[in-house]
Amino acid sequence: MLRPLAGVASDSDLWFAIISACWVALLYRHVIGAAFVYDDVAQIQHNAALLSWHSAAQYARAAVPFNSEFRGFGGSFYRPLFWFSLALDRRLWGLNATGFHFTNLALHWLNGLLAFLLLKKLRVSVVLSAAVSIIWLSLPIHSEVVAWISGRSISLAVLFLLTALLSAEWYLRSSKIVALLGYAIACFASLLSHEVGILTLPMTCLLLYAANSVRRRWLVLSGLGLVVDALYLWLRHLAGGHLSSGIPVIVGSGTSFWKYVGWMLLPLRMSIERSTDVPTDNSPMMTAAAFIGVLALLIAILQLRSKLPEVAAGLAWLCIALAPFCGIVPIYQGMAERYTYVAALGLVLAIVGLLSHLKSWTRSLGLYALIFWVSWGVWRLNARVLDWRDEISLYAKSLEATPKSSVLLYNLGVAFAEAGDASKAAVYYQRAIDLNPRYTSAIINLGNLFQSQGNYSKSAALYKRAIALDPRDPDAWVNIGNLYLQLALNQQAKVAYENAIALKSNDVEAIIDLGAALQRLGDLSGAEQAYQRAIAVDPSQASAYCDLGALLLQEGNVGAAREELIKALEHNLSYAPAYFNLGALYEQTGSPSLAIEMYKKALDIQPDYQHARSNLERMEARTGTSTAKTRP
């Protein structure tokens, strides 16, 4: 049986901290230069709520809905500390992804350090504790949590989970109230970071059993854990959070368990999107075999708890950590590699603990096998980290592991579209639609491609198809509104934008576009109100100030127009239309040199800005100057 050890800091702690920090930096060095990918784009890059603490506070007041478009369960999550960590990084680093990645690496390193300290406290030898933590830090399956900025919620929750366990161990030794307070705070913080924090209480019970604690202290800690869990669930309910809807896939839970174990041991192919791995069509024989295997593992834990305590503790940790993610609790994505982050620590402890008890030649053989496995894992991790540096490579490699993922096909389409390869983008959008005919995002994006190519009939048909599938999708209405506006069907555009806003009242893009439609219809008062409303919804939206300035200029209110255009540039110094409209303003007020300067700035930012080019050429022809320097 494991026993708590008196808390004394030693040189080994400092040396491990230094060595493990260097190890994590070496393993993940290639990810530092990676850009925002996958959910990072929406959750960080385009998330105005991270710009201030006041706006970020909304995540403490309300849960965030989510759904995975393929085999998802829907639901919502309540993770305010995760969002606050992103807001802090946004304030420190702006939109420099390197800073966000540095935070992720620091969290992973701290978790390895805390795991080392916890094992030492439980009288696991320094060598074994260091080996377990170093190996755990280098597992390739953790690349999703560490390299993906949005995967931080789990590593942040685990930081507090391990802190809670260290506080619990301290309380078992000392009975100090401050230790109990630290335990409660860490438990709550873990839950507010990610739902994986719910594991803190069962892990505490495992610690109490392993430490053979005094009954009274056992009751105090477990009771406090229950109170914290209840408080979190109540707060989550008040914020509108709820578990994913759907039927738990308990029948396939055994198969899911062994899939997770396989990913941890031999992640030959890895994927950022594992929703299609949820076992739904296994044969009865395979399902029964998986359950029998889990049952045999539980029996082995009971048999080994006295002879091989580290092995038994590691396997028990593994089972507890995986249980919620094996279909027992409905999860929006079903399965994911990041859900192994906690469980893998138990698996490594069991492997290293077993090796330490082997004798003679079997120990040497086991050691060689362990070295080979760890070395292969480091090589595999390096290859996977390189995938994270390139968005297309990340999705393509993930698709090899999960070829039936319509989400990955869609993301590949987006990546190729952003890279300017419209033909490949169309192919992947169509493949996503073929797999999931109700995938409205892919249908809309394919419509966008056809619209950009001038194929308006196909584009309109796709937008209408998306609306027919989901009339409550505001994006579909916005996109068909944009098409109508491009075709000068201004009344139809107005109706489409109004439908979008009715579904999503804070859709700034739809509100601004409604203003443009109203302006074309001659309703200048309505257009001005729309632009003002957009500014009220998002005061940082440069395009709203710019469009309002252009409208005021059209009305002859030059002073007010200039103020709005200057505000647009204050919010986005690289917004070319604001310079263009300032050029038009200066041209209108008889300041040709200033007009030329503004048109040139617009072209410096956007060389293919044809309206700016034609205005510049006209002004320079009038003043006798040359446009040579402005040609792309």
Model-derived segments and their meaning:
Residues 409-416, 428, 442-456, 462, ...:
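TPR/Sel1-like alpha-solenoid repeat signature
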